[in-house]
Design a protein with these regions (language model features):
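Cofactor-/ligand-binding subdomain signature composed of acidic, glycine-rich
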Residues: 1-49, 53
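Glycine-rich phosphate-binding loops that contact phosphosugars or nucleotide phosphates
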Residues: 75-213, 221-223
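Charged, alpha-helix-enriched surfaces in structured cytosolic catalytic cores
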Residues: 30, 55, 59, 124, ...
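Helix N-cap / loop-to-helix initiation motif
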Residues: 53, 139, 152, 257-258, ...
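Gly-rich Lys/Arg/Thr-decorated short loops/hinges at beta-loop-alpha junctions or inter-strand turns
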Residues: 17, 38-46, 106-117, 229, ...
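A short, well-structured juxtamembrane/interface segment
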Residues: 52-67
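Short, amphipathic alpha-helical interaction segments embedded in low-complexity terminal/linker regions
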Residues: 216, 221-311
Length: 311
């Protein structure tokens, strides 16, 4: 028997992420290929929904960069799938962009245990968000991004509200419009992807949308901070065999130098690819490369220009 529709008054209170599409009530009766085709078809709408928020995402990137240039941090706060996606993005910044410890932070309602198992009720406790953020001792140069598919998760909303009282920049990322989360934040990104094929399972389209937005946000922020050279991850520091191979490829691609020159530069710079590129292109020693990068806030193009002026 198909599920009965909700009463009209109850349905109006539900965010779109919790809505039930009657035409999908029989997915458990579908052939497997038809089921995955339906899900894949719905997934195609997600990039289009994200594209509708690119101006807001770009504005957020520029605002975050302004603060991180002054030493601020980027902090994600969420519960369940949304919080795990924030933690994932934060954890990928050090190996990709050589960010400093604590420069990008992921807060998850319920703590590390909630990464691998549900911590019942954690998302409904705003006091947990306050405790997590108070431990960080926020400053006006920090940015707190509350992430919630419905836009009404108490943990995420409380995180943004508290962060705003400290003067930190606040951003609300929701998958519905007119949410409490976005209303509480200084900047809002509303990626409305519509009901899920499996009603209320926001690890699907909503989770994909959140991952895409955070990919855009953190990557664009790091590009603007000079963590790349063109589209190369030059802030990589080689600490194992795989990373040493990658560092060699990056330096070779950036400089056009032969293998022997690349390896010599990486050895001199203790495996720091950005420094090694500067050693080769500016024809300087490793200490000089380090000084040029420090004077250029780590931006390789500016360090190269500075080396030319000093030559």
């Amino acid at each position: 028997m198909d599920p009965e529709p909700l009463p009209e008054a109850k349905r109006e209170r539900l965010p779109v992420t919790e809505a039930v599409r009657p035409e999908w009530a029989g997915i458990d009766l579908m052939a497997t290929l038809d089921l995955v085709r339906l899900m894949n078809s719905e997934d195609r709408s997600v990039p289009e929904a994200v594209a509708g928020q690119l101006e807001q995402i770009a504005a957020a990137v520029d605002a975050v960069v302004t603060r991180m240039t002054r030493g601020g941090r980027l902090v994600y706060a969420g519960a369940g799938t949304a919080g795990r996606i924030g933690v994932l993005d934060a954890s990928e910044c050090p190996p990709t962009f050589n960010t400093a410890p604590g420069q990008v932070v992921g807060l998850l309602a319920g703590g590390p245990q909630a990464l691998v198992s549900a911590v019942e009720g954690a998302e409904d406790r705003p006091e947990l968000a306050l405790a997590d953020l108070e431990e960080l001792k926020l400053t006006p140069d920090d940015t707190v991004v509350g992430i919630s598919a419905s836009g009404r998760t108490p943990y995420a909303v409380a995180a943004v509200r508290h962060a705003r009282t400290t003067g930190a920049l606040t951003l609300g990322l929701a998958c519905t419009r007119g949410s409490d989360l976005v209303a509480a934040a200084a900047l809002g990104i509303e990626v409305e992807v519509g009901p899920e094929v499996l009603a209320g399972s926001t690890r699907l389209k909503a989770g994909t949308a959140q991952k895409l937005v955070l990919n855009l946000l953190s990557t664009a922020v790091m590009v603007r901070l000079g963590k790349t050279y063109g589209n190369l991850m030059v802030d990589l520091r080689a600490g194992n065999e795989k990373l040493r191979d990658r560092a060699e490829r990056i330096v070779a691609q950036a400089t056009g130098a032969d293998e022997k020159t690349v390896r010599r530069a990486l050895t001199a710079t203790d495996g720091r690819a950005k420094d090694a590129v500067l050693v080769v292109l500016a024809d300087v020693d490793a200490p000089t490369a380090a000084r040029l990068l420090a004077a250029s806030d780590g931006r390789l193009r500016e360090a190269l220009a500075l080396s030319t002026r000093k030559a």
